[in-house]
From Swiss-Prot:
<dbReference type="InterPro" id="IPR010994">
    <property type="entry name" value="RuvA_2-like"/>
</dbReference>
<feature type="region of interest" description="Flexible linker">
    <location>
        <begin position="142"/>
        <end position="146"/>
    </location>
</feature>
<dbReference type="GO" id="GO:0006281">
    <property type="term" value="P:DNA repair"/>
</dbReference>
<dbReference type="GO" id="GO:0005524">
    <property type="term" value="F:ATP binding"/>
</dbReference>
<comment type="function">
    <text>The RuvA-RuvB-RuvC complex processes Holliday junction (HJ) DNA during genetic recombination and DNA repair, while the RuvA-RuvB complex plays an important role in the rescue of blocked DNA replication forks via replication fork reversal (RFR). RuvA specifically binds to HJ cruciform DNA, conferring on it an open structure. The RuvB hexamer acts as an ATP-dependent pump, pulling dsDNA into and through the RuvAB complex. HJ branch migration allows RuvC to scan DNA until it finds its consensus sequence, where it cleaves and resolves the cruciform DNA.</text>
</comment>
<dbReference type="GO" id="GO:0006310">
    <property type="term" value="P:DNA recombination"/>
</dbReference>
<keyword id="KW-0963">Cytoplasm</keyword>
<dbReference type="InterPro" id="IPR000085">
    <property type="entry name" value="RuvA"/>
</dbReference>
<dbReference type="InterPro" id="IPR036267">
    <property type="entry name" value="RuvA_C_sf"/>
</dbReference>
<keyword id="KW-0233">DNA recombination</keyword>
<dbReference type="GO" id="GO:0009379">
    <property type="term" value="C:Holliday junction helicase complex"/>
</dbReference>
<protein>
    <recommendedName>
        <fullName>Holliday junction branch migration complex subunit RuvA</fullName>
    </recommendedName>
</protein>
<comment type="similarity">
    <text>Belongs to the RuvA family.</text>
</comment>
<dbReference type="Pfam" id="PF07499">
    <property type="entry name" value="RuvA_C"/>
</dbReference>
<dbReference type="InterPro" id="IPR011114">
    <property type="entry name" value="RuvA_C"/>
</dbReference>
<keyword id="KW-0234">DNA repair</keyword>
<dbReference type="InterPro" id="IPR003583">
    <property type="entry name" value="Hlx-hairpin-Hlx_DNA-bd_motif"/>
</dbReference>
Length: 200
C-alpha cells in the first residue's frame, strides 16, 4: 500500500516518528535503532509496511528494505504478528535472525520477549527454508545514537514496549550504562539490556 515515506521529521518519540508529507503528519512505528538515525527538522526516507486491522491502520518504518522484507516474512510464521515481528527486529539484526533461524538457535530467538521455546521452534520450522542466508549488511556495526540521557530513554522505552516491567527496564539500563561510551549505539545497548534481563 505505502511502500515508503519521504519527508521532514516533525517529531521523534520513544516508539515512533512523525514524518510530514504534503502537510500531513504520518506517525510511523519504528525500532529504537531506526529512531536513533532520525533528527527533527531533517529529511528522512523510510521503507514502510502498512498493517490493516478492523479497527486500525498502523504504519511501520524500517532502516532499509531488507529489514522491511524480513518484518513481512516473519509475520508469515504462525503466531507472529506485527508487534512481535518488530520486537524481533528490535532485539536482533536481520542477519542475526537469519543465523538463528537457519542454525536452529532456539536460545537466541527466546531472547525476544513473547517468544518461548515452542514458539521459537515453530518459527524455525516454518521459516528455515525461506529466510535466506545472512547478507552481511545488517545492523551489526550499529547506529550511533544521541549522546547523554537520550539513549537511556530509548533503551528503557524499547524494553517497556517489548513487555518488560518498568522497574526491570530501569535496572537493565543501569547495567548496560558502562558500555555506552562516547557514541552510544542504541540497538547494541538494547540487545545487551535484553541479555541482562534474560539472565536475571
Amino acid at each position: 500500500m505505502i511502500a515508503f515515506v519521504r519527508g521532514q521529521v516533525a517529531a521523534v518519540t520513544l516508539s515512533s516518528a512523525v514524518l510530514e508529507v504534503g502537510g500531513v503528519g504520518l506517525d510511523i512505528m519504528c525500532t529504537p535503532g531506526t529512531l536513533a538515525t532520525l533528527r527533527v527538522g531533517q529529511q528522512a526516507a523510510l521503507p514502510t509496511s502498512m498493517v490493516v486491522r478492523e479497527d486500525s491502520l498502523t504504519l511501520f518504518g524500517f532502516a532499509d528494505e531488507d529489514e522491511k522484507q524480513t518484518f513481512e516474512l516473519l509475520q508469515t510464521a504462525s503466531g507472529v504478528g506485527p508487534k512481535l515481528a518488530q520486537a524481533m527486529l528490535a532485539v536482533l539484526s536481520t542477519d542475526d535472525l537469519r543465523l538463528a533461524i537457519t542454525g536452529d538457535d532456539v536460545k537466541t530467538l527466546t531472547r525476544v520477549p513473547g517468544i518461548g521455546q515452542k514458539g521459537a521452534q515453530r518459527i524455525i520450522l516454518e521459516l528455515r527454508d525461506r529466510i535466506g542466508a545472512p547478507t552481511g549488511a545488517g545492523r551489526s556495526a550499529g547506529v550511533p545514537a544521541p549522546a547523554g540521557a537520550v539513549w537511556r530513554d530509548q533503551v528503557h522505552q524499547g524494553l517497556v514496549g517489548l513487555g518488560w516491567p518498568v522497574r526491570d527496564a530501569e535496572k537493565a539500563v543501569a547495567a548496560v550504562a558502562p558500555e555506552a561510551g562516547d557514541v552510544p549505539d542504541v540497538a547494541a545497548l538494547l540487545r545487551a539490556a535484553l541479555r541482562t534481563l534474560s539472565k536475571a
